[in-house]
From Swiss-Prot:
It comes from Clostridium botulinum (strain Alaska E43 / Type E3). The lineage of its organism: Bacteria, Bacillati, Bacillota, Clostridia, Eubacteriales. The keyword Ribonucleoprotein does not apply. This is Imidazole glycerol phosphate synthase subunit HisF. The gene is hisF. Belongs to the HisA/HisF family. GO terms for molecular function: imidazoleglycerol-phosphate synthase activity; lyase activity. It holds the Pfam family His_biosynth.
Amino acid sequence: MHTKRIIPCLDVKDGRVVKGINFKGIIDVGNPVDLAKHYNDQGADELVFLDITATHEKRGIMMRVVEEVAEQIFIPFTVGGGLSSLEDIKAILRAGADKVSLNSAAVKNKKLIKESAFYFGNQCIVLAIDGKKRRDNSGWNVVINGGRIDTGIDLLSWVEEVTKLGAGEILLTSMDADGTKNGFDLALTKAVSDITSVPVIASGGCGCLEDFYDVLKNNTSDAALAASLFHYDELTVKDVKKYLINKKIPIRV
């Protein structure tokens, strides 16, 4: 079993870290620079920064905030939200990001995945895929624009396609589980991990220590991402790692 990663996520709106349930009911939870440093010091393996309204508002990402966060941390840093061109990606990497997360723009322009992987290396191209279960329970669809638009695209087919196009990693969020604290969507996560050779980061729904274990055991995922659980100090990164070590999950100390 490969070494697993614990990744806090900063969902940023108007320069502040926010959190909601199923991308709705947004509330302010803190300053992104302060929280980034806090998680870096706690021993997080990576940090994800998502400007959650950049695409919907048709604007660029908050570059200044990205630069300030990058100055405060010494762990791999992924940035996403509103990136729609090679120029956008180049600017974010120059601002201090180690990886970029593509979501809505990649669905609208598949060529961006292939070109960005070619120019910048697939190791820094993370495909963020938000999935929602179909009403007839026959599988999952890809949703974009912060969950506002159901594309009708079959999620598993999309995973296979983006892997072939050069995505180096999948950041998989279950819209059904997001913010509920009822546990990760294990069925969705396992289904994705089974059909792709690239690492899968599970996101959405984590509510307790056992949820981390459930999604990381048996190679269900390569990494687990959480937000509100860490923001509200219900658990620390150290708590999670100590628990996983006791459960014999390979993790960086």
